[in-house]
């Protein structure tokens, strides 16, 4: 399966809550506003200091624990709600993917964990997630709090891969990418529409890539990676000889 069970559940919940239909490219900003307790804010020349200023202008004090820099996207979540910031001057396809990526983080790395904890410990555990009190001993030993961000949750989508991470962080980012791609271009819809009968892998990959960009509005880089991953997941990836040529 291209998505793990939890990720697939998040995608299905989003589709049902947001009334996502069969029209593509998906209006992801509208879908987010319908499906999630989150808003999308577009800022030109998006920097962390600009995010801080936006939050301060609404009466809250918040600072990132790092220097200000330009980012493609940013998620700030607190109190069960999220704000997705996106670079307003990026091309439309890049903005679409950024919003979907940050929405994926909001669902899988923040909201889901919070909701599961509330279901297990009761609504008062939300005070712990929001950093308004320390967890009790019983709450502290609960596995749901392991690795959870208490207080304000933030996530940044950098403008390049210079700071590419490994290990657990890579897996989290990869999961967010997969959820984002499934929201914008559901694998079952893509595979039902594309012709993968070409004998050469390069031709099959180009066919999927073109559909992802033209029909679903994905930016070139994630579209290319998605095309290859989808083909491999359905047994239409590169042959052994072709894989040697791709290295």
What are these regions (language model features)?
Residues 1-247:
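Active-site hotspot residues in diverse enzymes, especially metal/ion-binding acidic/histidine motifs
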């Amino acid at each position: 399966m291209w998505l793990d069970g939890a990720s697939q559940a998040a995608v299905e919940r989003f589709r049902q809550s947001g009334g996502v239909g069969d029209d593509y490219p998906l209006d992801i900003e509208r879908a987010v506003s319908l499906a999630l307790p989150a808003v999308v804010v577009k800022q030109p020349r998006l920097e962390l200091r600009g995010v801080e200023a936006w939050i301060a202008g609404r009466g809250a004090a918040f600072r990132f624990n790092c220097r200000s820099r330009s980012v493609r996207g940013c998620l700030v979540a607190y109190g069960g709600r999220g704000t997705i910031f996106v670079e307003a001057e990026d091309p439309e396809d890049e903005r679409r993917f950024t919003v979907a990526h940050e929405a994926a983080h909001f669902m899988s790395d923040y909201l889901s964990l919070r909701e599961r904890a509330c279901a297990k410990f009761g609504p008062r555990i939300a005070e712990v997630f929001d950093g308004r009190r320390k967890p009790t001993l019983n709450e502290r030993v609960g596995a749901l709090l392991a690795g959870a961000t208490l207080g304000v949750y933030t996530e940044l989508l950098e403008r390049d891969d210079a700071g590419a991470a490994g290990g657990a962080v890579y897996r989290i980012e990869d999961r967010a990418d997969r959820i984002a791609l499934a929201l914008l271009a559901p694998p079952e819809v893509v595979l039902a529409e594309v012709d993968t009968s070409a004998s050469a892998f390069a031709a099959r990959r180009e066919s999927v890539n073109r559909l992802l960009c033209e029909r679903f509005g994905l930016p070139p880089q994630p579209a290319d990676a998605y095309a290859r991953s989808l083909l491999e997941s359905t047994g239409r990836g590169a042959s052994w000889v072709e894989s040697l040529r791709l290295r």
